[in-house]
Amino acid sequence: DCNVPRCTTGKYLKERPSFTLDPAPHAGAYYVQEAASMFIEQAYRKISADFTPERLLDLCAAPGGKSTLWRSLLPDGALLVANEPMRQRAEILAENLTKWGHPDVIVTNAYPNEFSGCCGMFDVIATDVPCSGEGMFRKDEGAVTEWSPANVVTCADRQWSILCDIWPCLRTGGYLVYSTCTYNRLENEEMVARICKELGAEIRSEEH
């Protein structure tokens, strides 16, 4: 086993064991996720160099892997709001964060526009938005059959709607962390450019 370069607590495994037979993840001792998801620690280092976040919203949080990492990085006393719009997925999110065991977490089941009363409330908003899933091709044949150029456009439209709904909830000088699990420019580089142009954001870093 070896360390994930961008995450001090992440480990690569040489082979995939049967996690369901290991009591440790069921007790919240560790969480299994793709190494790519662990970019969060790199993002947090950039943020914490400017200020220490007190309130972070993980907007599309289920099943909870990124939320566990955000919560591990945040200081004690900071609040993580882990949200999932889909009810069944929100229940899974709540279960995983309950296992993780940190008290300063609130799990919500709301659509982005339902946060309209939280104007300027959050120091950081993490948006791992629903996408066309091109990053899933290597392990999910269904993702390949579901993909189409039209679906890419549909996903980009949905992402923009989500961003417009949630943008007012970010305080002045706060950070929006935008991520997808897809590769096309429309949902990534072009979306980030649109966020900057139409919402007035500034790119903090272009490091990859």
Task: For the regions a language model picked out, list residue spans one by one.
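S-adenosylmethionine
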Residues: 1-207
